[in-house]
Swiss-Prot record:
Protein name: Kinetochore protein Spc25
Species of origin: Drosophila persimilis (Fruit fly)
Subunit structure: Component of the Ndc80 complex, which is composed of Ndc80, Nuf2 and Spc25.
Family: Belongs to the SPC25 family.
Gene symbol of the encoding locus: Spc25
Record keyword Cell cycle present: yes
UniProt lineage: Eukaryota, Metazoa, Ecdysozoa, Arthropoda, Hexapoda
Amino acid sequence: MADLKASEGDLSDYYMRLKKIFSNETRLQSREASISKRSSRVHKNIISAKEAIERQERDFGKLQKVLLNRNQELERRFTLGEALAQQLEVTRQRNADMEAQLLRHTTEGRQRSNELMECMHSLKQATGTYINHEALPARLNGVSVVRADDGDIKLIPFSLDGNDADGLHTLWRSLHTRTDNNASKWRKLISDQEVAGASPVTPSGSERPKATSKHSNFMPTSIIEIDLTSPTNDAS
């Protein structure tokens, strides 16, 4: 009996050990499965992270390329802006110089016109000869006032082609050889001009009468030549 009981006790102990071993193995398998699942999730997460990183790197490369292109475009625009600013400054300076030159020419022209008008007025007063300026330079129309010693006034009208040298010479000679007071004043003005060495004011180009061989040694320096191209507001 005692041996039987001892044998039963050994079997029971052996059973408990086997049961414990199986239980431990089951727990280990369960842990391995859990660890495997976790490892699989971690591996998937790592793969997803790598793919996300690769996508971000591609996007970053694209953005970097776009940024580089925009920086280059900004540099080109900045360079163009500087060039345009320099060109604008040069244009402004040129316009300022042209305005100053135009103002100077306008002032000189106005001064010259005033001088010619004053000269014309003086010659008109001295010679008693008045010209219709609206007809110039095509025609030389006007009237010469001759005052005799007894006070009588005689009006001598004239109408000549602006390019008729013979007609202009004849008019000059008739005015120059007059004996009235106006003619003497005129000759005094001419002699004063010759003494002062002043050059006659003459029109340019085709407006100036050309001397012919008949009068090659005598070219009139008169109000006719002075005012062929100069406007005036004096009454004709």
